[in-house]
Amino acid sequence: MDHRLLEIIACPVCNGKLSFNQEHQELVCKIDRLAFPLRDGIPVMLESEARPLPQEEN
């Protein structure tokens, strides 16, 4: 994941900052507790495609 993309991309739900979870290859919004998948290196920024994060996962 290009760090420059992380500087400009935002959560589509709250417009908050995202972090990259390398283990799961997801962009994570800690505010909404959603993880957006990457498919073929392209972020899928649809709320309907996001995975809800369990309380213990960041």
Curated annotation (Swiss-Prot):
Q: What is this protein called?
A: UPF0434 protein NT01EI_2448
Q: Which InterPro entries match?
A: Trm112-like
- Pfam families to which the protein is assigned, alphabetical: Trm112p (PF03966)
Can you tell me which family this protein belongs to?
Belongs to the UPF0434 family.
The UniProt entry's GO CC annotations, sorted and at most eight, read: cytosol
Quote the HAMAP family the UniProt record gives.
UPF0434
